[in-house]
Every structure is written in structure tokens, then in C-alpha cells.
UniProtKB/Swiss-Prot annotation:
Residues 163-279 form the HD domain. PANTHER family: 3'-5' EXORIBONUCLEASE YHAM. InterPro entries: 3'-5'_exoribonuclease_YhaM, HD/PDEase_dom, HD_domain, NA-bd_OB-fold, YhaM_exoribonuc/phosphodiest. Disruption phenotype: Non-essential, it can be disrupted. Correct processing of the 3' end of 23S rRNA no longer occurs in the absence of mrnC. This is 3'-5' exoribonuclease YhaM. The keyword RNA-binding does not apply. Residues 22-90 bind DNA. It comes from Bacillus subtilis (strain 168). Gene3D superfamilies: Hypothetical protein af1432 (1.10.3210.10), Nucleic acid-binding proteins (2.40.50.140). Belongs to the YhaM family. HAMAP family: 3_5_Exoribonuc_YhaM. GO terms for biological process: rRNA 3'-end processing. Its cofactor is Mn(2+); Co(2+). Its EC number is 3.1.-.-.
Length: 314
């Protein structure tokens, strides 16, 4: 089995199959077109440039294409890149499966679904419980498969469910410490806050934004979904309004994508939990790629900072 692409060190040669995660056209300083390819396997992804790209290359090397590459790992402007020597699409005879290149959550789907179901079962408010159960059941297949984002955090198969399970465990610990919090409301907010991403995003492979995702966004999508669920379940109570507020405010500020700031205690905590879990995932993934005594690449979503791995962290 080939070494994972993220396990290669600078200076090593790569000769293996990879999946094109994304392909972006650019124009070099000499006026010639090139493609920026994000190539992935189950260990992560790496950027590569295809210089002097022909128009036909945009089709040949489109996202979701499996390719055989030969190249060298090197550093360029603080980032690890793959310098291509050769690249070609695979043939059917090579019998390579796209699933073999997809990074997945570290917890099996059935275990994550069991955890989410248990948190719903523990809810005591019937209105909150019914709405949450209804929406999870409606979108269960996508909920268990989709990533939480196209980049930055939990951007892998089942990343959305993994993000939610981690947040639920954080929510439980915080609610144990602060008993004045409404557990039902907080748990429901965690489970539903990003569920609109099953319509905002295209799916778990070469994830991009749908038309609905670009024009509306997952927050607006989920507020509408909540309203429809309440109507179908004939629930007309303040719980619906408060759940909608938790969805609307979970990004915290207008400049971060929330139409309203948190104005309910559980909404404030939801925002912190979401932010904490996303940032922990970003840091963990960046630090996995370096040895003790080294700095990570700059993490754009964390104010473009680098993080140091202490020498005593093996």
C-alpha cells in the first residue's frame, strides 16, 4: 500500500494514485495558463501545480478524477506542495476505487448515529424533542455522510456528524457544570445548527457549494426547515422561535455570517462550543503533519498563525 500523501516528508518522491479534490485555473506571470490541483488520499491533501495547462486539461483533470502522479514533495512559501513530474488519469483496467481516497471520520457512522439518538432520547421537552427527531430522521443519510465544510474544519466524509458528536459531548460537560442551562435547547441547537449544510454542500466527494448554498447559505436553509417541521408537526410554541434564534446566531457576529448575535444563554454557549470544536480540529489536523520541535504551516482560518509542536509531544 502506498504511503499516505501527508506522511511524505520534504524531499521525498511520490509515485502513487491520488484523487483530484479541486482544480482551479490560473494565469502565470508569463501569461500561460496553469491548474492548481488539490490532490487527496485518506491521509489528507496536498497542492500541486500543472503548468502550461491546455484547455483540454481542465476536463481531463477535473474534480473527482483519480490520477497517477509522480513528483517530489517540497516547500514553497511556507506550504508543502507536490512538484509534478508526471500526471495522468487512471484507466478502468487499473481497478482503482474512489472510496479508497476519501478521508473519513474516526468514529463509525452507526456509533455516531447511536450517540445522537441517545441525546435526543434524553430530551424532556416534547416540542424540542419531536422537532429534533423529525429533522434528523428526514436528513439522516446525508447527515451521516456529509462533511462539515469545504475546507478549514471537519472537511471529510462524515465530518458533519463527527463535529456534532464532539459538540454534544462538550455541551454535556458544560451543562453538568452550569445546571441553569436548558440541556434540551442546547443539545437541539448542537444537533441542528449545521444541518442545513446537507443542502448547502454538494456531498462528501470534491465538496462544493450548491446553488442553494451559494444563494441562501446553511443558516437560512435551516431556519426554513425548522419552520416547515414545526408546521408539519403542528407545533406552535416559543420553542420554535428560540431554536430558530440558536441557528441564526451560532456564528456569533454579523461579520462571521450570523444575522443576529446570541441573545439567549444557550445560543451564546452554542456559539462557543461550535467555535471551540472547529478550532481544535484545525489545530489537530495541522499539528498531525509536523514532527515535535517543528511549526505547522500557517492556518488561514486561525488568523494565519503557525502552531508549534513541543519536543516532548511525541
Amino acid at each position: 500500500m502506498a504511503k499516505g500523501i501527508m506522511l511524505h516528508e520534504v524531499g521525498e518522491q511520490v509515485d502513487q494514485y491520488l484523487l483530484i479534490k479541486s482544480s482551479t485555473k490560473g494565469i502565470a506571470s508569463n501569461g500561460k495558463p496553469f491548474l492548481t490541483l488539490m490532490l487527496q488520499d485518506q491521509s489528507g491533501d496536498i497542492e500541486a501545480k500543472l503548468w502550461d495547462a491546455k484547455q483540454s486539461d481542465e476536463v481531463t483533470y477535473a474534480p473527482q478524477t483519480i490520477v497517477k502522479v509522480v513528483g517530489d514533495v517540497h516547500h514553497y512559501r511556507g506550504r508543502t506542495q507536490l512538484k509534478l513530474r508526471n500526471i495522468r488519469p487512471v484507466s478502468e483496467q487499473e481497478n482503482v476505487n474512489i472510496d479508497d481516497f476519501l478521508e473519513t471520520a474516526p468514529i463509525p457512522k452507526n456509533e455516531m448515529m447511536d450517540t445522537i439518538t441517545q441525546y435526543i432520547f434524553e430530551m424532556k421537552n416534547p416540542n424540542i424533542q419531536r422537532i429534533t427527531r423529525f429533522l434528523v430522521k428526514k436528513h439522516e443519510a446525508e447527515f451521516m455522510d456529509y462533511p462539515a465544510a469545504t475546507k478549514n474544519h471537519h472537511e471529510f466524509v462524515s465530518g458533519l456528524a463527527y463535529h456534532v458528536v464532539s459538540m454534544l459531548n462538550l455541551a454535556k460537560a458544560i451543562a453538568d457544570l452550569y445546571p441553569s442551562l436548558d440541556r434540551d435547547l442546547l443539545y437541539a441547537g448542537v444537533i441542528l445548527h449545521d444541518l442545513g449544510k446537507v443542502k448547502e454542500l454538494s456531498g462528501p466527494v470534491s465538496t462544493s457549494y450548491t446553488v442553494e448554498g451559494n444563494l441562501l447559505g446553511h443558516i437560512s436553509i435551516m431556519v426554513t426547515e425548522l419552520s416547515k417541521a414545526a408546521e408539519e408537526l403542528q407545533i406552535d410554541s416559543e420553542e420554535v422561535l428560540i431554536l430558530q434564534h440558536l441557528i441564526l446566531s451560532h456564528h456569533g457576529k454579523a461579520e462571521w455570517g450570523s444575522p443576529k448575535p446570541p441573545m439567549v444563554k444557550e445560543a451564546e454557549i452554542l456559539h462557543y462550543i461550535d467555535n471551540l470544536d472547529a478550532k481544535m480540529n484545525m489545530m489537530d489536523r495541522a499539528l498531525e503533519r509536523v514532527k515535535p520541535g517543528e511549526y505547522t504551516e500557517r492556518v488561514f482560518a486561525l488568523e494565519n498563525r503557525s502552531f508549534y509542536k513541543p519536543t516532548f509531544h511525541k
